[in-house]
């Protein structure tokens, strides 16, 4: 589904970040934003960025 380094859009805030870690056991990913912060979110709150 998701791969490390892939760009994603989180929630409906339209913030773009990169996938830092994927946890399929709990259906969560850790997203790293350009400002250096991290956030853990569920798969249902993330959309892939289309190139």
Swiss-Prot record:
This is SPbeta prophage-derived uncharacterized protein YorQ. It comes from Bacillus subtilis (strain 168).
């Amino acid at each position: 589904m998701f791969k490390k380094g892939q760009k994603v859009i989180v929630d409906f805030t339209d913030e773009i970040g990169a996938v830092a870690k994927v946890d399929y056991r709990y259906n969560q990913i850790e997203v790293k934003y350009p400002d250096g912060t991290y956030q853990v979110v569920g798969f249902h709150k993330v959309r892939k960025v289309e190139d």
